[in-house]
Amino acid sequence: MMKNKQAGNTLIFVLVILLLITIIGTWAIRGAITSLNITTNAQAQALLVQNSDAVFFQLESYADHAVKIAKLQLDNGMIGYVNKPENKGKELVYCLRKSEKDDKYNLGKASLVYWQGASISKNEMGQDGYCKVNKATDFTSDRGAVVTRIGARSILEGRKDWGHMYEGSDSETYGGKDIGTIIINATSFIPNLSTASADEINKCVMNYPSFNVVVDGVTKDSVADCLSKLN
């Protein structure tokens, strides 16, 4: 009888030990997963910043390249096009594709998006400028991780005297043409980290400008706002 009782106690003791090991192991796994998420998020943020910054670094380098900056200022160049009076407030959209290293800002590869009252206009120049996350060619590199959407818009509000003129020019230079105030926005995101479908993400990229616009007293969402809501 004593032997059976001892065996029972031993069994209970062993079961308790196994239960403790299971609990500790679960805590360790949860801790590891949490740490992995933090690392992944940090890496993702760094990757997004790197891709968006690359857009601005390249555009800044154009300022020292007479031919490249001149192309941007032509009527069919990014700056020249959005600076036309009839295009003020409209956003010219490009997809930063891995295959287009040298000719990113070709007007034939751009799209135009803007609000017309409460409706969005997005097909005036076709849809080649909108990134599609279900197309491997629309990612920024062969890794197929990041998609970057570039938006350019010329505005009239908030300009300072002479701040809209070409450097070293006067009111008669280039026929009195000015560059306006050009705002460039680069929106980068990693589709694989989202639970949203490709169709939902593509709609955000196409149906919203990069900038918040007030229409009839209502502030409209931007591309970033739409993507954030998708999670």
Feature-to-residue mapping (PLM):
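Aliphatic-rich helix starts adjacent to a transmembrane/signal segment
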Residues: 2-4, 13-51
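Intrinsically disordered, low-complexity regions enriched in Pro/Ser/Thr/Gly and acidic residues
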Residues: 96-231
